Amino acid sequence: MHWKRAQKGRNKLRRSLTSRQFEQFVATERGMLVRLAMNIQHHPEDADDAVAEALCKAWERREQLRSPDKMRSWVAKITVNTALSMIQKRKRVELVESMDDYPTTAEPGYPHSGIWHEIESLAEQDRTLVYLYYIYGFSQKEISAILNIPTGTVKSRLYAARQKLKNCR
């Protein structure tokens, strides 16, 4: 009986997440998802492919979303996993992208353009944490769920990344 109630709840959620709501989510968050995938993929075309595939997966698996409040972190996790999976399939990992592809001036809201260079010099796992926490505003708990690592690990890696960035001055 308990299973039927759970299934009924999922069906209700699936019906409640309309294609229009999903389209609104995509319109609002697509830029963040592309930048997140770009942080992993390092190529705009690959990042776009990863996001497109992740959004398809999210739509197909929308009944697995337990709470609409968690949609942003849930889709971000799917995007990260899809981008990493695509790299593994191609057996190609590029760690550093040419700085020519980065803006030479500060982006709106980020007055210190030099920090972008310093962030890019971090190890990939540290850079991903910095982007998720400081740039995209995910909580440490959400990052823990997205990357499948303990919250304590997120905290310690963020601390270490902050120390590295402070020492780069």
Task: Describe every region a protein language model picked out.
Residues 30, 34, 55, 123, ...:
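C-terminal flanking helix
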Residues 80, 84, 147-169:
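DNA-recognition helix of helix-turn-helix
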